[in-house]
Every structure is written in C-alpha cells, then in structure tokens.
C-alpha cells in the first residue's frame, strides 16, 4: 500500500489529483489501485470502463489458443521467427500491463505460460541480455518472480555477470572504440538491475549490489554500445510497448531500478537523479515523456514518478 498520498511538500504541484481526474481510464485505474485500494466503488466503476477498452478487446480477440499472437510478417528461418514471436509476446504483455491487467484472467495466464516456454532448458530467453532482463522484470510485475522456471532465467544471468558488475551481450555492437578495455553495457545493466531489484530475495544479493554500484557510478555516462548510445538517452523518461520503448526510461528507469534497494537511497548519484527528476515537473503538474522537449506531459510517466517517490519515502 502507498505510504504517501500527498506530494505537495516534495513537488511544486501535487499531480495525484490530476491523474485521478484527467488520466485515461487504464492509467486512472492503476493510480487508484495503487494509492487508494480501499475505494472499491470507484475502482469497480473504472474496472467496467477499462474492460471495454478497444485496444484491450482487440488484443484478447487476436490472441491464439496457445497464448501467443500472430506475427505481422512471415519468417522462413525458425530462429528468426521464434525471436520475433518472443518479442511480440513481450510487447503485448507490456501493453496489457499498462492497460491494467494482472495474472488473474485465463487469457493472461496463457500468455505468460507461452512467454515462459520461450526459455531454453538452461534458462535463456531468445535475443540479447537486455531482452532476458526485461522478460524477467515483466514476469515479476505479473507476480511470477518466484516461479522455479523463471528462477532459471535469473540464474542464467547471474552466471554471465561480468567482473565490473554489469552485463553485455556477446553480439552487441560497439558505438565507439573500446580497445582500452571493454566494460559492460550501461542500459543492458540498468534493465537487468531492475529485474533483480524486483525480486524479493535477489535484490539483497551480492550480484544485485555489484550491478547497482556499476550503474550508480555511471549515471549520465554515454553508453558505448548500440543500445541507446545518444547522449540524451537519459532524458527519455517514457516507456511503452514498442520494440525500443520497452527499454527506454532514462533517468526515471535508473531510479526505478535502484529504488527497491534501500542500501542505495543515500547514494549521491541516486539522490542527484531524484532531485533532477523533481525539477522536470511541468507547469501543468505532469512530468514529460522526454525532458526538455515535451510541454504537455505524460500521464504514465507522472504515475511512475509518484510511485518512485512513494517508494523512497
């Protein structure tokens, strides 16, 4: 349950009433469920409206009996088809999460089972390390972090953690010359750290502590791999269900990855990032999708900021 329901003392404007009044129904439902779970009447009304969401209906209608979704293109190579099917599963389960779904409906259960089935016997999911980390984080959001099969995915990553505390996929391209020594990929490690910090047992492990130290030491660094090498990658606060959007989040994702780790709350770069986030609040009370270039604000980003601030109170 939320610790904080009034943000007027720590922000210029308290955005919570704005979210409850103006956000799209799925976001409003999630906000109320997080901050006011005791308001059963309003939650019930929003639940009815949420279930009539056109995109939600479309996703469930197009879902196959095995829990998967049909690909937009035909792939003749099996490995490519499996990878793209896995990616589609991540995208749709992410979108459904943002639409307010949980693991309770049978259709979601089938989709989650299908996602887990993409794992190999050793725990590896298709594609790269950041896809592995994101899949584990997503499964944790649906309450499956302790599932024995999901645990194999975490163990697979633990075995591949580098001495510097981070991770880098063997196939990942470098965006600059690293002849002086290859360090782990910053954004890959942030995504994986978020998966580990979402795990009630592993968040206090030495592996997570090393990963948290790696990313905190490199706050605002430019990444040296092909995963978001642009200097302003830290300004992209939004996340969504698109191929790249799942891995965005910038400074907000950095903070979300570290917030469950109480031992990081006094870290100077974590505190610096939190202070910077607070400064990004717009005059209308919302937070931007991308800092410095969004004047309207984003309801989803604002909800994530409030959850973050609540978590570290």
Predicted regions: what they are:
Residues 1-313:
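Preference for long, amphipathic alpha-helical scaffolds in soluble/luminal domains
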